């Protein structure tokens, strides 16, 4: 079935659900597409042995709050293929009831040109993240995804047009604060709600400035 393979299918990279996180981390095409964000999002996850066993399908199906994988793939406008329900956006998939009688078979990542940055805050390097942040820019439109809130990752867009005039220190700070106020955070053993809100604004600002510098 090729469920452990990464294939190029027209305008997409098509990943079987059994592709390991380590395979994604080391894949030249995916890293070139994301300017290294793919490797950055995966390299902190526990250890190489674990990443050789953990799969992209399991990471997405669980819709775990701490998922680095889900955070980045939402920013990439990824799609999923389900055996019964067919193809849908990953963002739509995250809204489905968790008790789905279906099977996730493939993940599709669009090849279109975009800028991507991934950042996370961890108490120690291989721990679950305290907060995750993925930013992408395509055709002048910005997408921000915040995960480990500690709930499941959510997508936030520039609804107020704060970045319409370009990214500067001031606009990056304003957008970071806007996302931090719109996002819903909670407390867990790793961090409190207020701490996560503060970190969110910082990661978004840093990510935007890094993206602007690389662009």
Predicted regions mapped to residue ranges:
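C-terminal structural segment of proteins
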Residues: 1-215
